[in-house]
Amino acid sequence: MSESNPAYGALPYLQTHFVVAGNGRIFEDRLIARTRKKTKGVIRKQVVDLRWEGGQIADRLNGDSNLKSLLTTVLLEEGDIRIDPTENGIRIYGDWKPEYKIVMSKQALETYNAIAGHVKSYLSELTRK
């Protein structure tokens, strides 16, 4: 076997992305954000506090108490959630997971939908100005 070809193939890790249409690169500094969570417990881990950090969208997301209550249950299964603007859209995604753990709960889908709603409304406000 050649030194340049590793003995393994592609790793079976996947990441779920949700995309909001629009040119996010124009407002990149305002739209980039991620969650930071504080957990307690080892065996029965739970999220005790969380906050969004990043651009101005983080302030809007921090102000939504309904989203915060959804995130306290979802962040344990999804890991940190990030918002990343690109030229063709704004990506919303969680951590990498092994392919056998790719399961989307109803609460996770509601959470991503709520985040996408905030991003979409904020992006429309920015483009109207």
Regions found by a protein language model. Name each.
Residues A7-Y13, A21-K129:
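Charged, low-complexity intrinsically disordered regions
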